[in-house]
Amino acid sequence: MPINPQGCKSLDAFRTLREGKTLYLPNFGMETLHHVHAEDVAGVFFAAIQTGKSAYGEGFHAVSPRAVTLTGYAREAASWYGKEADLAYEPYETWKARVSKEDAESALTHMLHSPSGSMEKAKRLLDFVPKHTNYEAVRECLQSFGEL
């Protein structure tokens, strides 16, 4: 299940966008998410094994080429359904009443950390570049759930 534009795992946000309804985002929607495709995670591991000594003792991120904001993500996801995103923003404390406790906690964790990693080290030491963007990883996941 992909993390959705609200920062949680519910498919409800995607369904709201598909239906052209207003999607409420927490805070200002400028927090970031950084998805990764499973093939790219495996690719980093495989490249590290193949490279050998230059990878020993090193840590590598496995992420797509760049992070996305909640707002940008919502707009892109709406376009997959042929829609324009109708977005509204609420302070987290107000917004969390709209979702389950689990989703509210997940969103808060993502907002507080606002993940954004770099693949530069993997490129430099392993000659590895991810094959998939954030959006490609999410789209493929949604397709597997029959949501696209």
Tell what function each PLM region has.
Residues M1-A13:
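Flexible, glycine-rich beta-alpha linker
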Residues R15-V36:
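A conserved pocket-lining segment of Rossmann-fold NAD(P)-dependent short-chain dehydrogenase/reductase
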Residues K21-T22, A38-A48:
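Glycine-rich, aromatic-lined ligand/substrate-binding cores of catalytic
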Residues G29, H34-A42, G59, A67-T71, ...:
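Conserved loop-to-helix N-cap of the C-terminal "lid" that shapes the substrate pocket in Rossmann-like
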Residues A38, T71, A97-V129:
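Conserved C-terminal active-site "lid" loop/helix of NAD(P)H-dependent oxidoreductases
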Residues H132-L148:
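Amphipathic terminal alpha-helices
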